[in-house]
Regions:
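Surface-exposed coil/turn segments at beta-strand junctions on protein surfaces, enriched
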Residues: 73-75, 94, 149-153, 167
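Short, low-complexity, Pro/Ser/Thr/Gly-rich segments in the mature regions of secreted, periplasmic
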Residues: 201-208
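Beta-strand-rich interaction surfaces with strong enrichment in secreted/lumenal proteins
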Residues: 67-71, 144-149
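Short beta-strand and strand-turn-strand segments in soluble, beta-rich domains
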Residues: 62, 134-144
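Internal alpha/beta core interface subdomains
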Residues: 14-19, 29, 207
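Catalytic domains of carbohydrate-active enzymes that cleave complex glycans
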Residues: 1-16
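Ser/Thr/Pro-rich, low-complexity mucin-like regions
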Residues: 151-196
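Surface-exposed, glycine/proline- and aromatic-rich loop segments on solvent-exposed faces
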Residues: 20-129, 178-191
Length: 209
């Protein structure tokens, strides 16, 4: 029917995997989301009036070129497996834009200016955990819990408790994106022209529909 169709909801199998089992065959059961690669590059080009002004526009925020994001769940956790083209750069203390996952939930209430409720990995700790923070409309963040993480070369795995995101075994639908080294995460345009964002710009992927 070209006018409309009945909504199709998908079946998501419960799969449990250790956060450090980045090469487990269980990841073959995940939902896989693919990003464009090769566009995460330094920029140094003449401005539109450059022939007259000699002004160059430069950007060197390119760092981790995100390739794929795989997502699974069980009754207690969401699991993310993120791959990059080259080995992921090491986290540096205080870097709030290192390999972030931004999440929007169905009934999450107020969001930040980009429409997300949660940000993961704005802080990374030496005990193998990272922050899960609630986003506020004024651009502030408040810690609500922690996720587990494991990094091996170009693979980053994240294990997030559903209850930290106010989700459950029966309610796990999310919209999400992964981004790295965004120059101004309060400005949606920065998700187009700095660092890397998967998917690009203001777009999100959906899991659990």
């Amino acid at each position: 029917n070209y006018k409309c169709s009945v909504a199709k909801h998908y079946i998501y199998e419960d799969v449990s995997v250790g956060v450090n089992d980045f090469d487990s065959e269980l990841w073959g059961k995940a939902s896989v989301y693919r990003d464009f690669t090769g566009e995460c590059m330094p920029r140094n080009f003449l401005r539109h009036d450059g022939d007259f002004s000699g002004v160059y526009l430069t950007d060197d925020t390119n760092r981790n070129d995100i390739d794929t994001v795989s997502v699974m769940k069980d009754g207690e956790y969401l699991y993310f497996r993120i791959t990059t083209v080259d080995p992921v750069t090491a986290y540096q203390n205080g870097d709030t834009e290192w390999m972030n996952i931004r999440i929007r939930t169905k009934n999450g209430g107020e969001t930040d200016s980009l429409g997300y409720h949660y940000a993961i990995n704005r802080e990374v700790f030496s005990d193998g955990t990272s922050s899960v923070q609630r986003c506020a409309p004024d651009g502030s963040f408040a810690s609500v819990g922690r996720a587990e993480y494991f990094l091996s070369r170009n693979v980053l795995c994240i294990k997030v408790p559903l209850n930290v995101l106010k989700l459950s075994a029966d309610n796990y639908q999310i919209e999400f994106k992964v981004n790295d080294n965004i120059s101004d995460s309060s400005d949606v345009l920065s998700f187009y022209n700095s660092g890397d964002s998967a998917p690009i710009g203001g777009l999100s992927w959906q899991f659990g529909y």
